[in-house]
């Protein structure tokens, strides 16, 4: 729902209301994207910004009324009155099944792209898609980019997501990944679900965003506003 706040008969602010992960939320419409609203206004860090506003990497994929959509190219106003589901809003069973499958198959390293991939897979799964078919999985993955893991282990996880996997030694897996990459790595279900601890996800409250403009910098309270101010 789109609401207008009026003072003295003059409309001064638009409010976008929608359902996010089962809760009704209100967001000021600044003309930006759904991704900006989720991250900058609502503090949803599981939805990643990999290429905005290009809509090419799939890291910000969410479900809008049950269908996978890329949040960085979805204007906020288009979700008024609709239902938005992030990886945080998936059922506990869906989160567990998919994160366990990804961990068991080594289908993630940094975990930046996996929340969006999991959201898309779940969206297709809920609509009855057969994810045991490679062509179905590959079609879904065509909307995503993964720079470090590659597709084979993700295909394996998707094909066998319904299987109860044996436990994996996560400490040993993290140690092996650290040796392979040369930097500390954390392997576990929380990484698959977008809780890997990226710098952009742990910025202090009320931080400003700086954007280059000519020979200087422009600062604002959100990336959208900073880019707009920078021209």
Question: For the regions a protein language model found, what residue spans apply to each?
Answer:
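Short, Lys/Arg-enriched N-terminal segments with co-localized hydrophobic residues
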Residues: 2-12
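Glycine-rich phosphate/adenylate-binding loop and adjacent beta-alpha elements
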Residues: 62, 67-78
